[in-house]
Amino acid sequence: YADAVARATPAVVNVHTAKVITRRVHPLLNDPVFQQFFGDRFARSRKEIQTSLGSGVIISVQGYVLTNNHVIEGADEIQVLLNDGRSARASVVGTDADTDLAVLRIDLDKLPSIVFGNSDNLRVGDVTLAIGNPFGVGQTVTFGIISATGRDRLGITAYEEFIQTDAAINPGNSGGALINAHGELIGINSAIYSRSGGSQGIGLAIPISLAKGVMTQIIEQGHVVRGWLGIEAHDMTPELAESFDLSFAHGMLINGVMRGG
């Protein structure tokens, strides 16, 4: 699978973020008795730089980078490091918390870009390769298979149809590429099921079929628009049917209409 890896790795990047956080002091440090001896040097709030890392995928030569929303959420500065050693500051084009996706943009010449595969035709047992920056050690490739498709009801995001793989995915892999045996992008590595914090053989990736629709809307209009009914509804029960003098007990009761619905 070296050819597949060689085809995809130039387009997989490391994403480094930094944000300024304010550390609040312990209430005890504001105690007048404490300050009598030590003054207020310990009582002042402190600003610190918090850094984190993740991965991303260059999806076009125009410099668009697809990653996870949780990788860059709240960041004051985002730096993208390419496999060829170049780096650039990234701007946020848009994010979608409901799918945990984000699109960044970098301004560099002669950029590589990933080739999209088809995640709708995946079968359990197909070979997969995960590419990312686990624990910040540098670009790493792991091997596995498709363990399941369409994983949902996991409580991770609002819209879920995850690809499950046993290719090792660890902290730092988030936003990186899940590719097939041809080096084509089939998913964005997003989460793991683990009690230890490291890989235990259950990695989850957002299928590219879902990600493409989200990233297209973000690039074209800066955000994602979804249809909604705007109603409050309740399943019909035999008790409700009787109270409304209905001869059937199936369907849905509309309790109310939301503003704009």
Where are these regions (language model features)?
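Serine-dependent protease modules
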Residues: Y1-G260
